[in-house]
Amino acid sequence: MNSKSSARAAIVDTVEAVKKRKYISIDEGTLNNVVEKERKFLKQFLSGRQNLRIAARVFTPCELLAPELENLGMLMYRFETDVDNPKILFVGLFFLCSNAFNVSTCVRTALTAMYTNSMVDNVLSMINTCRYLEDKVSLFGVTSLVSCGSSCLLSCVMQGNVYDVNKENIYGLTVLKEIILEPDWEPRQHSTQYVYVVHVYKEVLAKLQYGIYVVLTSFQNEDLIVDILRQYFEKERFLFLNYLINSNTTLSYFGSVQRIGRCATEDIKSGFLQYRGITLSVIKLENIFVDLSEKKVFV
C-alpha cells in the first residue's frame, strides 16, 4: 500500500471514529476541520519529519565538487578566499580530507584522483597558506540538493533533517571511515550518538598541517568532550606546544570542536562510496538531525 492509499484509509477511519462519538454534533464544518487536521498530521507522519528546517542555497564552481555531485548528505564548508573574485567558495569534507594529515596515503591518493582539475590545485594552495584552517574555512551545512549548470546550486541544511523538496527521500551524512573517532569507553552503547567535527594541528616536515576527525559520542556536554579530546591527543598536544615554542609563532590553540548534530545509534551504518571507479569505505549516519553549534577551541 502506497502513502496516498494509507492516508485515505486513515482519514476514513478518522471519520468513522468521529461519527461514533455521540456527544459530538457532526456537521460539514466539524468534519472538514477534523479531516484537515488529520491530513496535516499524516503528511508529517508519513514523511517521518517535521516541516521546520533551516537551509541555505548557494552557488559554487562544479569543478570543486566530485562525489558531492552524485551523493547527497555531504558536509560542506564555506571558504573565504583572499581574492576579489570569487570571494567565497564552498568545498566538501572529502575535498579537505585530501590534504589532511590523519588520512592515509592510499585514501588521500584516491581523493586526489576524484578531484582532478587546475582549480582544485589553486584552492588547495590557498587553503595551505592559511595560518589555521579555520581562519578562512568554516562549517556550512549538509547537502540536500545539488543542481548542475555553469555553476552548481547547493542546498545545505544547517538545522533540521536532510530531505528533498518533496520530502520523499531522507538523506543522512556520509563520512570517511578513516576519520571517524569514537572516544567513549564503550562506543555506541547508548541510543543516541552526538556528532562533532574536530580540527587539530600538527607539525609535518617543519610545516603546520591540519587533521579532521568526526567524533561519535554519547556525551552532549561540550566541555566534557574537550577534556576527553585533550586526553586523547595528549602526545600531539605536547608536540604542538613544542612547535609553538620553537617557531615563535602567535598561534593560540591546538584544536577546535563543533557539534553538527545527532542521530540514533542504530542508524549508524558502514558502507562504500563509489565515484569514477574509485571505492572508499565510509560511515553513513542515516536520519541525522543537523544542529550546528558554536565552535570551541582548546590547547
Swiss-Prot record:
This is Triplex capsid protein 1. GO terms for cellular component: host cell nucleus; viral capsid. Keywords: Capsid protein, Host nucleus, Virion. GO terms for molecular function: DNA binding. Its main location: virion. Structural component of the T=16 icosahedral capsid. The capsid is composed of pentamers and hexamers of major capsid protein/MCP, which are linked together by heterotrimers called triplexes. These triplexes are formed by a single molecule of triplex protein 1/TRX1 and two copies of triplex protein 2/TRX2. Additionally, TRX1 is required for efficient transport of TRX2 to the nucleus, which is the site of capsid assembly. Interacts with TRX2, MCP and capsid vertex component 2/CVC2. It is found in: Virion; Host nucleus. One of its GO terms (biological process) is viral capsid assembly. It holds the Pfam family Herpes_VP19C. InterPro entries: Herpes_1.
